[in-house]
A protein has these predicted regions:
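Acidic/polar residues at beta-strand termini and the immediately following turn/coil
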Residues: 2, 68, 200-204
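Extracytoplasmic/periplasmic, Sec-exported soluble proteins
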Residues: 14-25
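Proline-rich intrinsically disordered, low-complexity coils
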Residues: 6, 39, 69, 121-125, ...
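Hydrophobic/aromatic-rich core segments of domains that either
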Residues: 23-107
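N-terminal accessory/pre-domain segments preceding catalytic cores
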Residues: 13-14, 103-216
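Secondary-structure boundary elements
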Residues: 1-14
Length: 216
């Protein structure tokens, strides 16, 4: 993500120069979806602080979802973490971030509306399905504070040698319960043994992300 990227309102900024802003990201994502036979629509509007923004609506296997490719780029969150609703906890968190954040990938209207307000001259689809949501497909979506599911999430991350684990909660009740178990009661050390664990939480997006200074 680079505000000074050349031709940053077009797909050229992405494919020719490897850097862009939200409009370039969204148009490039739309183009790739369309090349793959996936219907995709460019959506423009604003985010929480009134800043103009662009994202997409895509149709996967007959169901519509929203996807914000620029907010999925960690370099964007480094520039505007507060705008993206992410609260950092732990001095090492920035250096341990993965390159992709899935909080805004194939989400519902209800989820995207927490941070995004569309302003387009055409009706947008009501996105209600979670079937192809990243966290659902990866077993990281929690409808209750299921500690066996938590254990499986960390075991899978270790097997796949991933440096972080993000848990997505269905609602605030689940979020608060997992926060209490893993952080307040420090049960996180059952899954990431060691002296310290870096983490980031987003109550707005109902996610808890954990890293260690060494790989899982």
């Amino acid at each position: 993500y680079d505000l000074q990227a050349p031709e940053n309102q077009t797909i050229c900024s992405v494919f020719l120069y490897g850097k862009s802003v939200c409009q370039g990201y969204a148009k490039a994502f739309q183009y790739l979806c369309q090349r793959a036979g996936i219907p995709a629509v460019l959506v423009t509007g604003t985010v929480e602080d009134g800043t103009p923004h662009a994202w997409t609506a895509v149709c996967c296997r007959g169901e519509w979802y929203y996807a914000d490719p620029s907010w999925g780029d960690v370099s964007y969150q480094t520039e505007g973490a507060e705008e993206a609703g992410m609260e950092e906890n732990g001095a090492e968190a920035d250096g341990l971030r993965e390159q992709v954040d899935y909080d805004f990938f194939l989400v519902t209207t209800e989820q995207i509306s927490r941070t995004h307000t569309a302003d387009v001259p055409f009706p947008l689809p009501e996105c209600v399905s979670l079937t192809d949501n990243y966290y659902v497909r990866e077993g990281l979506y929690f409808t209750r504070a299921d500690m066996e599911q938590v254990a499986e999430a960390f075991e899978t991350a270790a097997q796949e040698e991933r440096g972080s684990v993000t848990l997505k909660c269905a609602d605030e009740t689940v979020y608060e319960a997992l926060y209490d178990r893993l952080l307040t009661q420090q049960e996180i050390f059952q899954y990431l043994p060691g002296d310290s664990v870096s983490f980031a939480v987003s109550q707005e997006q109902l996610t808890l992300t954990f890293w260690r200074t060494s790989e899982l």
